[in-house]
């Protein structure tokens, strides 16, 4: 499979810096555009319950999620790839993960998740 160049919207890093500086942001949802060549911020969430966080994750679509766990001040990078996602889409999100992680200084933990149950103990 041909490797694609993934462009990173600068807002991805800007929102990450806000999350690190303890602004009201608790999680950042990153998504690839329809051409799978641009990673952008889909949404940010302020402090919400664990249940609300889990409900905000699309069950059938991949996302890259940056989550700040305030109880221990850790920043977790989550690569959410549901089981039903096609291999080509999973590959694109893998490339996007690699590209964005090179720009984000301060990630404490990395998780590859295929089932929401894995996130129930964040």
UniProtKB/Swiss-Prot annotation:
Keyword Cytoplasm among record annotations: yes
Cysteine disulfide links: none
Entries under Pfam families matching the protein: Cofilin_ADF
Occurrences of domain ADF-H (ranges): 3-122
Subcellular location: Cytoplasm, Cytoskeleton
Keyword tags: Actin-binding, Cytoplasm, Cytoskeleton
Function: Controls actin polymerization and depolymerization.
Family assignment from sequence similarity: Belongs to the actin-binding proteins ADF family.
Protein name stated in the entry: Cofilin-5
